[in-house]
């Protein structure tokens, strides 16, 4: 058995996102998912990571607290970066499915930027229809 590829992780992310409750996905209209093996050095430094395995995902963009509801000409879309190798390492040591881990990372990366509490995000994850 070989490790899931970048494309397979992206497909899992798309499926995980599609399974989330509509009240959450409406907040995220236009969000773009990117999958890379690892975060780049700039991101690792910015997030103060000790190793390249410390970061499973990252939201880049504007959440509602930052004014995402306001249209900006030429603004980059909101993006969620998923980091394949750290996710796979986490999965190898977890009892959760890979899909559950990806769902968790997506909900938390997006949720924090939209001002959701941990309790809100747990409810969203429980509402996922996988």
Language-model segment annotations:
Residues 1-101, 113, 117-122, 128-130:
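Active-site rim/adjacent substrate-binding subdomains
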Residues 105, 109-113:
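Catalytic glutamate of the conserved HExxH
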């Amino acid at each position: 058995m070989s490790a899931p590829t970048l494309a397979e992780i992206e497909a899992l992310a798309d499926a995980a996102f599609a399974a989330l409750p509509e009240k959450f996905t409406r907040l995220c209209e236009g969000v773009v998912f990117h999958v890379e093996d690892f975060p780049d050095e700039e991101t690792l430094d910015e997030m103060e990571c000790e190793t390249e395995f410390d970061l499973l995902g990252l939201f880049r963009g504007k959440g509602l607290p930052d004014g995402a509801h306001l249209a900006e000409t030429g603004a980059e879309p909101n993006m969620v970066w998923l980091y394949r190798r750290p996710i796979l390492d986490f999965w190898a040591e977890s009892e959760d499915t890979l899909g559950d881990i990806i769902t968790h990372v997506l909900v938390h990366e997006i949720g924090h930027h939209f001002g959701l509490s941990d309790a809100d995000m747990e409810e969203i994850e429980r509402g996922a229809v996988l």
